[in-house]
A protein has these predicted regions:
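Cell wall/extracellular polymer interaction/catalysis modules
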Residues: 2-172, 186-195, 201-205, 212-214
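Helix-capping/helix-break motifs at membrane-protein junctions
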Residues: 182-183
Length: 215
């Protein structure tokens, strides 16, 4: 059976993704760090979700990236786009927790997400398994990854979009710690990929978060 049957629209949408026999550099980077790489390639969409936190310390902008990489019949695919890995300025200064705003710590989080509804409203990836966050509590308009205050657990760290109809340029209130895609159309394509992946490989998605300097 052709696993692409029934997802012609997705094939059209993925024309811009990079296809190459060579391993993507983000996959090489996470492999070097000792993280698991999913590369069983008899069926498509065995996803490696790699988020890259920018070296640029500027806050409230979508200056990070996410790569959805999978290998199919010996050929790698790399669909990538801008995101934010970090909370917006509003939530940095108005944390939901008295311990501070949640910033996802770099690492690999097995089965972190499943498909579901973000805040009960629209299809997204929602937290299923524990994640480790660093608490930024000093309200200094900067992302503080060295506070020393860490927590592991369920904090509603989802992957969702910003504005539903147009691209978002400032993070603002869109993220209180979630990984957020600023572009609604690209997010729709993402969700098509996750739907297909969950049918084939199960409804469980691992996040690997690294620094730009790891590349």
């Amino acid at each position: 059976m052709n696993r692409w049957t029934g997802c012609q629209n997705l094939k059209e949408n993925l024309k811009e993704s990079k296809r190459n026999l060579k391993e993507p550099n983000v996959i090489t980077a996470i492999r070097k760090k000792g993280y698991d790489v999913f590369e069983q390639d008899s069926k498509p969409f065995n996803l490696n979700i790699v988020a890259i936190r920018s070296n640029d310390p500027k806050v409230n902008v979508f200056n990070d990236h996410m790569h959805l990489c999978w290998k199919y019949r010996g050929q790698w695919n790399d669909f990538n786009f801008p995101i934010t890995c970090d909370a917006g300025l509003y939530w940095l200064n108005n944390p939901m927790s008295k311990l501070g705003t949640a910033i996802v710590k770099e690492g690999q989080y097995k089965g972190l997400w499943k498909t579901g509804l973000h805040r009960g409203k629209y299809f997204a990836l929602v937290q299923k398994n524990p994640v480790t966050v660093i608490r930024d509590y000093n309200k200094d308009d900067k992302i503080d990854l060295e506070s020393g205050v860490e927590q592991s657990g369920h904090f509603g760290i989802n992957h969702h979009r910003g504005n539903s109809s147009k691209e978002s340029f400032k993070v603002g209130k869109w993220s209180a710690g979630c990984l957020v895609n600023p572009h609604p159309r690209i997010f729709e394509i993402e969700m098509e990929i996750f739907r297909e992946a969950s049918k084939i490989w199960g409804d469980s998605f691992t996040l690997t978060l690294i620094k730009e300097s790891d590349l």
